[in-house]
């Protein structure tokens, strides 16, 4: 069960960084 928590934390951190970059810089890929 500990592995699931670590995976959840990793995905959450990646999503936060991804959205932070997206909101800071508008996406120019495929648009």
UniProtKB/Swiss-Prot annotation:
Q: How does it assemble?
A: PSII is composed of 1 copy each of membrane proteins PsbA, PsbB, PsbC, PsbD, PsbE, PsbF, PsbH, PsbI, PsbJ, PsbK, PsbL, PsbM, PsbT, PsbX, PsbY, PsbZ, Psb30/Ycf12, at least 3 peripheral proteins of the oxygen-evolving complex and a large number of cofactors. It forms dimeric complexes.
> What is a biological process (GO) this protein takes part in?
photosynthesis
> Keyword Transmembrane, does the record have it?
yes
What transmembrane ranges does the database entry give?
A: 3-23
User: Which keywords label this protein?
Assistant: Chloroplast, Membrane, Photosynthesis, Photosystem II, Plastid, Thylakoid, Transmembrane, Transmembrane helix
Q: Which Pfam families match?
A: PsbT
Give the superkingdom in one word. Answer: Eukaryota
Q: Where in the cell is it found?
A: Plastid, Chloroplast thylakoid membrane
Chain's role:
Found at the monomer-monomer interface of the photosystem II (PS II) dimer, plays a role in assembly and dimerization of PSII. PSII is a light-driven water plastoquinone oxidoreductase, using light energy to abstract electrons from H(2)O, generating a proton gradient subsequently used for ATP formation.
Protein name (database record): Photosystem II reaction center protein T
The scientific name of the source species is: Gracilaria tenuistipitata var. liui (Red alga)
Which family does the entry's similarity section mention? Answer: Belongs to the PsbT family.
One GO cellular-component annotation of the UniProt record comes to: photosystem II reaction center
Disulfide connectivity? none
Q: How does it sit in the membrane?
A: Single-pass membrane protein
């Amino acid at each position: 069960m500990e592995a699931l928590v670590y995976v959840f934390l990793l995905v959450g951190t990646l999503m936060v960084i991804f959205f932070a970059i997206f909101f800071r810089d508008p996406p120019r890929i495929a648009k």
